[in-house]
């Protein structure tokens, strides 16, 4: 399963750099995620990168883009010129900053090698080539660095100078999923939650009233422990019903 031909486990993202977006604080450094009516299950983000410049983008699972037959650039323009028009009225798009790409997600598959086969004769795959992008946040740098560290631990430049044995590749694959599997699986669950408009609205309303739930939602972007709690059926039932 080296190639995901149907693109079931891919997201697409479109990014621009804007200067002077209203309500953005360089010092605070807050990352904003917005789930906007009319473009769900996609999400819109804004975060500062310094000197009054913001990274502004839009992301959506590739399968959902195909279903809706939409372009991410058009969806982002719809959000900026509609719901966020006031915040962008004095902002300036930085020329040449528009870029789109596909993200190979680390969501679990029904295969023996998860998330996808990451080894072959004489090689190990790391980062995006191993499909390690977080399905919920779209972040991939941390997992790429971790996979590189794991790959190095299985390779000896003297012993393996004529090529990496398949058995070592298999061990690397198992260690990779043992290390990242739970986190990626929980992120996949969170990604699926955002496909249900009523659940997103209900969850956000409850989070506005409950500090603990609001904290978990914020920490889920960076904390494995918070993601585990947030995908617990009992915790969700307790917070969302009572």
Regions found by a protein language model. Give the residues of each.
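C-terminal helical "tail/cap" subdomain of flavin- and related membrane-associated enzymes
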Residues: 156-242
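Electropositive phosphate-/nucleotide-binding environments in soluble metabolic enzymes
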Residues: 8, 69, 138, 142-145, ...
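Predominantly flavin-linked oxidoreductase catalytic cores and closely associated redox partners
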Residues: 1-91
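Flexible, active-site-adjacent loop/turn segments at secondary-structure boundaries
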Residues: 12, 16, 31, 37, ...
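Short capping/connector residues at structural and topological boundaries
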Residues: 23, 38, 54, 108, ...
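A general structural signal for short secondary-structure boundary/capping elements
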Residues: 31-38, 60-63, 81-83, 91-96, ...
């Amino acid at each position: 399963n080296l190639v995901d031909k149907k693109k079931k486990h891919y997201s697409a993202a479109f990014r621009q750099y804007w200067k002077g977006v209203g309500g953005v604080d360089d010092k605070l450094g807050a990352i904003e995620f917005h789930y906007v009516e009319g473009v769900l299950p996609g999400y819109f983000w804004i975060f500062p990168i310094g000197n009054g410049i913001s990274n502004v983008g839009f992301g959506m699972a590739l399968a959902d883009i195909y279903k809706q037959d939409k372009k991410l650039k058009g969806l982002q323009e719809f959000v900026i010129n509609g719901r966020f028009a006031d915040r962008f009225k004095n902002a300036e798009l930085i020329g040449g900053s528009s870029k789109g790409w596909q993200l190979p997600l680390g969501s679990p598959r029904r295969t023996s090698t998860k998330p996808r086969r990451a080894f072959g004769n004489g090689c190990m795959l790391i980062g995006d080539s191993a499909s390690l992008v977080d399905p919920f946040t779209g972040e991939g740098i941390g997992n790429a660095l971790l996979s590189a560290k794991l790959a190095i631990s299985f390779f000896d430049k003297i012993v393996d100078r004529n090529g990496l044995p398949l058995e070592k590749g298999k061990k690397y694959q198992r260690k990779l999923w043992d290390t990242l599997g739970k986190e990626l699986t929980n992120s996949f669950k969170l990604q699926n939650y955002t496909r249900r408009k009523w659940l997103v609205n209900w969850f956000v309303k409850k989070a506005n009233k409950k500090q603990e739930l609001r904290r978990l939602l914020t920490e889920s972007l960076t904390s494995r422990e918070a993601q585990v709690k947030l995908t617990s059926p009992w915790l969700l039932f307790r917070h969302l019903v009572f």
